Amino acid sequence: MTDEPRNASIRMDALQAHHAEAAARWATRLGLPRVGETDFALQLGDQGLQLVELGDKAPGPVRVDFVEGAAAHRRQFGGGSGQMIAKAVGVQSGIRPRILDATAGLGRDAFVLASLGCEMTLIERQPLIAALLEDGLQRAELDLEVAPIAARMRLLTGNAIDLMQNWQGEAPQVIYLDPMFPHRDKSALVKKEMRLFRPFVGDDLDAPALLAAALALASHRVVVKRPRKAPAIEGTKPGYVLEGKSSRYDVYPKKKLEGA
């Protein structure tokens, strides 16, 4: 699903001795060495699982945290159902669609929609990112306030196109896509997460196939998040567009969403 990412080396570390056993299980599951000189490390500590680049000028670690920080702020002050993403997927009075986020990443958008009451299924194809997301969801389930939101988020790991083409059970009403765009803007290079993930993920170059699979599966609509000035994904044209300052949502309607 990507161009060929550069060959980055990574090991598994336990930051405290009492996490050694759990770190060993992650290492076995992900096929990571426990020792050796590497470019990156997946670390397990008291704050959970985190990915960090090693070296003098490396940025800090990245972890998934749905309880505190940016996720908590957006949950409390983010604008609720008036947010553009909510409008794009069809959230309105009496309507909370079942949504598949086929490009979950660190789960931020899925968490926003789950916090608004949507039942979410998430797909993440990169095992390291999926591990961070799984760990973040497990910690969220331990928080009294956030646990009901996390309970609405189900994580699948694998190739989104394959999973959508072989979908079992009731189809999602809405499929949400946020393909990693080949960034040319130099400012994007300084973003910590982009810098960390690019060696493992690369750019999504088969977005047209992803969109086609989504359109075939979704019962009501497909929504694609894009940089504001980026072209639409090749293939079917969006029915309408919601545009913000830096990004936009291309909406492909199939059927009107109705309340229960």
Curated annotation (Swiss-Prot):
Segments traversing the membrane: none
Broadest EC class assigned to this enzyme: transferase
GO terms for MF: rRNA (guanine-N2-)-methyltransferase activity
Binding residue positions for S-adenosyl-L-methionine: R108, D109, E124, R125, D178
Superkingdom of this protein's organism: Bacteria
Subcellular location per the Swiss-Prot or TrEMBL entry: Cytoplasm
Record-level GO cellular component terms: cytoplasm
Record's keyword annotation contains Nucleotide-binding: no
Pfam family, one: SAM_MT
Reactions this protein catalyses: guanosine(1516) in 16S rRNA + S-adenosyl-L-methionine = N(2)-methylguanosine(1516) in 16S rRNA + S-adenosyl-L-homocysteine + H(+)
Coiled-coil stretches: none
EC number(s) on file: 2.1.1.242
HAMAP family in the cross-refs: 16SrRNA_methyltr_J
Similarity-based family: Belongs to the methyltransferase superfamily. RsmJ family.
Purpose: Specifically methylates the guanosine in position 1516 of 16S rRNA.
Protein name: Ribosomal RNA small subunit methyltransferase J
The encoding gene: rsmJ
